[in-house]
């Protein structure tokens, strides 16, 4: 009889044939255990990614789940249903171009030592991570009371207790929100679930900037799926304001032609008609949170926020400030958001 694994690593993917083998080898080196299990959860458009995974030699046992529904969350949830209910779970992005066994090992060790969740905290290029830096970090802090520098990190570890809470929380979600969690909303959802435990959530500070496939081309889908999940906790009527730490940005040159192209893409994404009064950031974000607290569906509030977000990211990309100023600007905006929305429960006297 095959022994139950103490650790399951889940590798969600869609068309990552060029990087899946390196990520698999790095995860296997971190596990270093023939009782561990690596689950490839794949919804690729061709067999190439699964073929590359199966061809990668590992010490750990492997399972390849193919033909899964499209969506990162759907892949992860299906893998958890099959293999991840009673053990520590490692999640690893499969588009990573510089996978490091030490990172995965550090995440696992912290959870094994008693944390409910450990997340990679890597520096980000200043022109990337726009959803994290301008929106997700502040909203996660509001909802959970935890300042998590990279709340949407795809590289993380979760305790067995955290994993056991996932199915019930997922099935309790409204239909539209559940579909968001089946996509890019999964990262925020897992963090929100873990935050309900008493055990700590631990960011693992890393020195190297993460190298991965650019997310900018997928910005509309990522926003539409992640932001409703980030806003949904406002229905509780309670917001918390932990101290927000420094933002770590990595400098790099953004060629003028590329910047021009990105700004044009952002302009093209802006709805012709929208419910938008050009409220300054982060007050537009605060208004979206208040709307959800007042009964507006999180999906609707996210749609209202979209034009303001596009304008804010455009301004950020066009700005010529240095990294130190940019980092201070991000921290000030997140702090202002939290202080603006700090409240007491609705039923308090």
Where are these regions (language model features)?
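Short beta-strand/loop segment that forms part of the nucleotide-sugar
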Residues: 11, 34-45
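Short, well-formed alpha-helical segments that are part of the catalytic scaffolds
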Residues: 15-29
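Conserved donor nucleotide-binding strand/loop of the catalytic core
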Residues: 36, 50-74
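A conserved acidic beta->alpha catalytic loop
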Residues: 42-51, 96
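Active-site nucleotide-sugar/metal-binding loop of Leloir-type enzymes
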Residues: 74-88
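Short beta-strand-to-loop acidic/aromatic patch adjacent to the donor-nucleotide binding site
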Residues: 86-97
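Conserved donor-nucleotide/metal-binding helix-loop-beta segment in metal-dependent transferases, i.e.
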Residues: 99-121
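Terminal low-complexity segments of carbohydrate-biosynthetic enzymes
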Residues: 224-349
């Amino acid at each position: 009889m095959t022994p139950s694994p103490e650790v399951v690593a889940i590798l969600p993917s869609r068309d990552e044939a060029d990087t899946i083998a390196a990520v698999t080898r790095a995860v296997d080196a971190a596990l270093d255990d023939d009782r561990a299990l690596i689950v490839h959860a794949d919804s690729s458009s061709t067999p190439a990614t699964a073929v590359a995974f199966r061809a990668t030699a590992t010490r750990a046992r492997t399972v390849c789940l193919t033909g899964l529904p499209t969506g990162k969350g759907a892949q992860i949830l299906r893998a958890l249903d099959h293999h991840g209910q009673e053990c520590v779970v490692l999640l690893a992005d499969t588009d990573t171009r510089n996978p490091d066994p030490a990172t995965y090992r550090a995440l696992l060790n912290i959870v094994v030592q008693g944390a409910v969740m450990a997340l990679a905290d890597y520096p980000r290029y200043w022109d990337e991570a726009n959803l994290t830096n301008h929106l997700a970090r502040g909203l996660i802090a509001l909802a959970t009371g935890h300042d998590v520098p990279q709340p949407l990190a795809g590289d993380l570890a979760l305790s067995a207790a955290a994993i056991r809470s996932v199915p019930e929380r997922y099935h309790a979600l409204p239909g539209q929100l559940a579909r968001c969690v089946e996509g890019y909303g999964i990262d925020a959802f897992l963090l929100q679930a873990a935050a309900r435990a008493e055990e700590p959530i631990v960011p693992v500070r890393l020195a190297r900037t993460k190298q991965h496939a650019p997310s900018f081309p997928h910005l509309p889908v990522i926003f539409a799926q992640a932001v409703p999940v980030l806003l949904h906790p406002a229905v509780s009527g309670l917001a918390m304001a932990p101290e927000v730490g420094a933002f770590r940005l990595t400098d790099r040159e953004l060629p003028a032609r590329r910047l021009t192209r990105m700004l044009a893409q952002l302009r093209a994404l802006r709805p012709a008609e929208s419910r938008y009064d050009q409220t300054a950031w982060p007050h537009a974000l605060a208004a979206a949170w208040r709307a959800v607290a007042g009964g507006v569906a999180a999906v609707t509030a996210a749609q209202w926020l979209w034009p303001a977000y596009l304008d804010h990211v455009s301004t950020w990309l066009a700005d010529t400030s240095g990294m130190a100023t940019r980092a201070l600007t991000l921290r000030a905006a997140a702090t202002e958001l939290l202080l603006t929305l700090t409240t007491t429960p609705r039923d308090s006297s």
